[in-house]
From Swiss-Prot:
Main location: cytoplasm
Keywords: Auxin signaling pathway, Cytoplasm, Developmental protein, Growth regulation
GO cellular component terms listed in the entry, alphabetical order: cytoplasm
Taxonomic source organism: Arabidopsis thaliana
Species lineage: Eukaryota, Viridiplantae, Streptophyta, Embryophyta, Tracheophyta
Domain of life: Eukaryota
Protein name, UniProt field: Auxin-responsive protein SAUR71
Keyword Lyase in record: no
One Pfam family this sequence matches: Auxin_inducible
Function: Plays a role in the regulation of cell expansion, root meristem patterning and auxin transport.
Expression by tissue: Highly expressed in the steles of roots and hypocotyls.
Amino acid sequence: MKQLIRRLSRVADSTQYSLLRSESQRGRTKKEKHKSWVPEGHVPVYVGHEMERFVVNAELLNHPVFVALLKQSAQEYGYEQQGVLRIPCHVLVFERILESLRLGLADRVT
């Protein structure tokens, strides 16, 4: 899992990486972006120092890569953090992780 995160970090830092937009930004108007509505079966998470909001499928939280990210979150922010779920990860790396999970690539790398 750590190996996958390291590999994705290197890819995110490369100049060939094209920026992926978060699911919360795809195909939505400005008015819709500010809503706090979350579809059933999904969880909002805030990523990185920028606190960029992502809406991810709750089933992903059990994936080993996400478990590793959640452990990092617990180490950095503690288990008693209130309010939002924060992930201490660069936004570009997180977007790359989501894309890899979506394409089914994360299982092959771990």
